[in-house]
Amino acid sequence: MSTVEPNVYDPQQVETSAQQFWDATRAFQVDENSEKPKFYCLSMLPYPSGALHMGHVRNYTISDVVSRYKRMTGHNVLQPMGWDAFGLPAENAAIKNKTAPAKWTYANIEHMRAQLKSLGYAIDWSREFATCTPDYYVHEQRMFTRLMRKGLAYRRNAVVNWDPIDQTVLANEQVIDGRGWRSGALVEKREIPQWFLRITDYAQELLDGLDQLDGWPDSVKTMQRNWIGRSEGLEIQFDVRDIDGAPLDPLRVFTTRPDTLMGVTFVSIAAEHPLALHAAKSNPELAALLETLKHGGVSEAELETQEKRGMATGLTAVHPISGEQVPVWVANFVLMGYGTGAVMAVPGHDQRDFEFANKYGLPIVQVVKLREPRNEEEQTWDATHWRDWYTDKSRELELINSAEFDGLDFGGAFEALAERFERKGQGQRRVNYRLRDWGVSRQRYWGCPIPVIYCAKCGAVPVPEDQLPVVLPENVEFSGTGSPIKTDPTWRQTTCPDCGGPAERETDTFDTFMESSWYVARYTSPNARDMVDRRANYWMPADLYVGGIEHAILHLMYFRFYHKLMRDARLVDSDEPVTNLLTQGMVIAETFYRDADNGGKDWINPADVEIQRDERGRVTGAVLIADGQPVHIGGTEKMSKSKNNGVDPQSMVAKYGADTVRLFSMFAAPPEQSLEWNEAGVDGMARFMRRLWVQVHKHVGEGAAVALDVAVLSAEQKAIRRKTHETIGKVSDDYGRRHSFNTAIAAVMELSNALAKFDDASEQGRAVRQEALEAMVLLLNPITPHASHALWQVLGRGETLLENVAFPQADASALVRDALTLAVQINGKLRGTIDVAADATREQIEALAQAEPNAAKFLEGLSVRKIIIVPGKIVNIVAG
């Protein structure tokens, strides 16, 4: 029985007691049970940064609510937890704190595990792992060597950000205004050998698979479709001439708009293209530009925002139809890693080419017009002013200035050109994808070692499986200049597995997306000798995956791809890793600041600010508690370290209790929307928890309740019982189908309020109240499990795991009403209400509605033309 003092809600004591019971009974450990339907629910695993933030709390509470609800509805539920433990932040922390990344990471895991446990999540901790341990990453090393042998992993040069001072590769986020974040050195673009996985071999399957993911948000599927970027077009060959007219290797370009081919006035190539390097040998000015472009961005997003720059190479390309020679230009918006590194430039019908041509005075030719212009602007074409219709393929177009192709529409031109080029061997139809192969090499220390050995005689050799894992040394001194494994000859130097000669290990490590691409499957069989075992096919695919929409493309794309690799390796049977995806919104909070001496802003944590609000709760002013002086109000933004507007979950748990924090995080907004943190709202949830606690103890203190006898209930007792079962029905739907936890909580609060007004101390009155209180405790259990655990005992039901108690079912007979209240409208305007028997006839309802005193007053002098009855809701009298 609960030892908590009646009428005093002590969250810490309640929560400690419940958690001790769950731990002692291993309440949430599961195995494969064919007698129950399985439900595999998880959140995206956290990076062990050192402390939970409110985004974590919201994410994991959503998963926990669904998991606990599913247990109560008879499912065999797996909810695991682990740690995405490799990555750049550990290296940065190691530099700052002068400690090894491993030591920092493992200490953070210990701390964050304790934080998670304090929130009472129903996690099977027996399946916990950290992705930085050899027991975990040995399996992805083994998989990689198998992919190498199948040709799905390969090595080629790729462009990276290079810091010449620190002698290291930088992630895009480590480049600030073109300089290294730590050294301040001007960052260069450098080509280095890197390993790739052929995700492009799966592009069409990844695209088609989205049509089967009915449980994924449309927004995520749209982002993935756009990222895969399937397009149908022609690959066309342009012969190339050197400055002296000598032939060079031809260019092949891909275009989805072959109808604009006669508008090509130049060809653009990437700065790293072999033809650009060839031309630069005899052109110092061009060579200088190529050197400058080394310092530019390496991503499509960066290139889109950069000022467009370029230079003529002196080379020319031969137009494949007209035979005219057009100049070849280097352009900084062409990526060597995208397509062929060359594009045919049609400035008349491509905005990027249009801007470039206008900047450098290149010809611009119109070769397409609208067949049915909508206005005068669409009838005119201006080579100095861009209009969107110039490139609108969705409109009906007609070719002009295109020789024998004049008058054709897009489809006709596509077919005519495709037939011509295929017949002459100058081109072919092609399906192209925006998706690029996945570069998995990272020039960092704190990651999974890539299991490859380099031999002067044998080349790149996969590490034999009996020599795996290649273990990353953890006890290192990390300065941030270079990688400890690069500078450690005892680790780096080895022998070739094929010839036995001297060789060296690969010193790059895997992209950390590798670890997070298969961990969901590993939870199903965490002690398996291979990557997974037969248990994976019991649990996979996961039934619900909860995480932020910011992971819609990279993580979730690689996640789907890697699962298909595992399927093709016969490790899993399913095509997709997750059936349903829930993308929760951000946690946001108010921001406050003072102007800094350097012109910036000093951001102040909301906990250090006293806020003034108007009667509607809006912030009208704020002062710093320390000095009483005003601070600026910066608006509401995502909680972040940079804006210093985060709220420490541990401080909230210490102040209010885990259940109250969980309750607020589920009540403040629907899961998919942003949640604004508001401590006044947390106070409100704390008051509700105390009120519920008192309601239960007050009821129990008045003595035991007799058995409920529905045959003798009064009208008021029936009304409360009906409210109870209406609430059960709504909350069941909100939990199970809609994931609308805020409305579920609101419904329970309404029932609590109705019960507070129910002043009936009779035996059956108390029986009705007992049923309602038991229902409330069970309905709230997925969200407030500690308090529910205690209150269930107070209600005389004993100490048990509530997840094994069946979720309440609405009694259909309790929902039947003896009488109904209907709104009475006159010509659509509310004029009164009437109470009618549930089985009243239409004639009786019409008579009562017209006799309602206020309605009768408005009907004076009017004739009733029609009476519309919406059953159970409205009577609308149409009169004139």
Swiss-Prot record:
- Which catalysed reactions does the entry list for this protein? tRNA(Leu) + L-leucine + ATP = L-leucyl-tRNA(Leu) + AMP + diphosphate
- A GO term for molecular function: ATP binding
UniProt motif 'KMSKS' region: location: 638-642
Q: Which domain of life is it from?
A: Bacteria
Under which EC number(s) is this enzyme classified? 6.1.1.4
Q: Does the keyword Protein biosynthesis apply?
A: yes
UniProt entry keywords in alphabetical sequence: Aminoacyl-tRNA synthetase, ATP-binding, Cytoplasm, Ligase, Nucleotide-binding, Protein biosynthesis
Q: Which locations, inside or outside the cell, does it occupy?
A: Cytoplasm
A Gene Ontology biological process in which this protein takes part is:
leucyl-tRNA aminoacylation
Motif stretch ('HIGH' region): 46-56
Listed Gene3D superfamilies: 2.20.28.290, 3.10.20.590, HUPs, Isoleucyl-tRNA Synthetase, Domain 1, Valyl/Leucyl/Isoleucyl-tRNA synthetase, editing domain
Q: Where does ATP bind?
A: K641
Top enzyme class of this protein?
ligase
A single GO cellular-component term on record: cytosol
HAMAP family per record: Leu_tRNA_synth_B (MF_00049_B)
* Family in the record: Belongs to the class-I aminoacyl-tRNA synthetase family.
Mind telling me what this protein is named? Leucine--tRNA ligase
Q: Which organism is it from?
A: Xanthomonas euvesicatoria pv. vesicatoria (strain 85-10)
